[in-house]
């Protein structure tokens, strides 16, 4: 008989992004395969009652109490959720109340402050940074590099594009990326377009076997994906980084979030979004 998986619910009065982020940061500490579900826009007592019923049914069917992470703000809605048989982790109760006491002032209790368009200026920064990342992807446009906060450079399929997009969306950082081509690697020198922006460069590298796996998924049985080619490109790229004094990080075992955080810290970048 198959053992039931523990159910986890992320409940929010908005998108559920914050509940997911906070919950995942805790769940990753346990080597368990959770069955996860997000229930957004629980912003009325009626909706909360429906959620409670759903949680209680899930508990009865599996014999295991669901684990619930909630970022619901409204006090009445939260009171309804607290009647569930599930294990409820209410981030509002856990963090806001102690903060109110320490700061000696009540919180705003405004729904959606962390992800809603509360500050139009911050929204514009995020969109502008995102557009910059997309327009300056893979060396497509280089004449606006003077505006970049950072320029990621690496061989193909090392994680440049997703890292730039994450830096833009999460931190409002203007991130461009430039691919190191076969000619660049053969010369062993920085491409001319990057020389004047050397102080903004940050390199990415990757383990050869991982790079081969990624490239084989895209172009199987090609020279581009061969072990020989991948080994050559990685070795030459790392040698170039060292000779030019360009900081770099191996992305093989790192998440996009970890890569971005390391770049911000080591390159001393100033984030525009919090």
From Swiss-Prot:
Binding site for ADP: 154-161
Pfam families noted in UniProt: Kinase-PPPase (PF03618)
GO molecular function: ADP binding; ATP binding; phosphotransferase activity, phosphate group as acceptor; protein serine/threonine kinase activity
Entry keyword annotation includes Translocase: no
Domain of life: Bacteria
Annotated catalysed reactions: [pyruvate, water dikinase] + ADP = [pyruvate, water dikinase]-phosphate + AMP + H(+); [pyruvate, water dikinase]-phosphate + phosphate + H(+) = [pyruvate, water dikinase] + diphosphate
UniProt KW keywords: Kinase, Nucleotide-binding, Serine/threonine-protein kinase, Transferase
Enzyme superclass (EC): transferase
InterPro entries tied to this protein: Kinase-pyrophosphorylase, PSRP
EC number(s) recorded for this UniProt protein: 2.7.11.33, 2.7.4.28
Function comment: Bifunctional serine/threonine kinase and phosphorylase involved in the regulation of the phosphoenolpyruvate synthase (PEPS) by catalyzing its phosphorylation/dephosphorylation.
Family designation: Belongs to the pyruvate, phosphate/water dikinase regulatory protein family. PSRP subfamily.
UniProt-listed NCBIfam families: PRK05339.1 (NF003742)
Protein name stated in the entry: Putative phosphoenolpyruvate synthase regulatory protein
Native source organism of the sequence: Alkalilimnicola ehrlichii (strain ATCC BAA-1101 / DSM 17681 / MLHE-1)
Lineage: Bacteria, Pseudomonadati, Pseudomonadota, Gammaproteobacteria, Chromatiales
């Amino acid at each position: 008989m198959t053992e039931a998986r523990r159910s986890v619910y992320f409940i929010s009065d908005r998108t559920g992004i914050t509940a997911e982020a906070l919950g995942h940061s805790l769940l990753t500490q346990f080597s368990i395969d959770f069955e996860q579900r997000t229930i957004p826009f629980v912003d009325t007592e009626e909706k909360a009652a429906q959620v409670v019923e759903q949680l209680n049914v899930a508990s009865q069917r599996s014999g295991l109490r669901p684990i619930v992470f909630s970022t619901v703000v409204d006090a009445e809605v939260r009171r309804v959720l607290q009647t569930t048989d599930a294990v409820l982790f209410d981030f509002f109760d856990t963090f806001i109340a102690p903060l109110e006491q320490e700061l000696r002032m009540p919180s705003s209790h405004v729904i959606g402050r962390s992800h809603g368009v509360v500050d139009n200026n911050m929204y514009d920064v995020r969109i502008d940074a995102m557009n910059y990342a997309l327009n300056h992807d893979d060396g497509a446009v280089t004449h606006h590099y003077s505006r970049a906060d950072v320029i990621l450079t690496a061989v193909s399929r090392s994680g440049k594009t997703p890292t730039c997009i994450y830096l833009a969306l999460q931190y409002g950082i203007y991130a461009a990326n430039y691919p190191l081509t076969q000619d660049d690697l053969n010369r062993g020198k920085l491409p001319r377009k990057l020389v004047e922006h050397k102080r903004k460069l940050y390199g990415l590298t990757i383990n050869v076997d991982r790079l081969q796996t990624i490239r084989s998924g895209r172009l199987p049985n090609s020279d581009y994906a061969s072990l020989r080619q991948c080994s050559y490109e990685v070795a030459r790229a790392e040698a170039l980084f060292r000779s030019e004094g360009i900081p770099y990080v191996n992305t093989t075992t790192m998440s996009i979030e970890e890569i971005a955080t390391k770049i911000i810290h080591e390159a001393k970048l100033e984030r525009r979004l919090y």
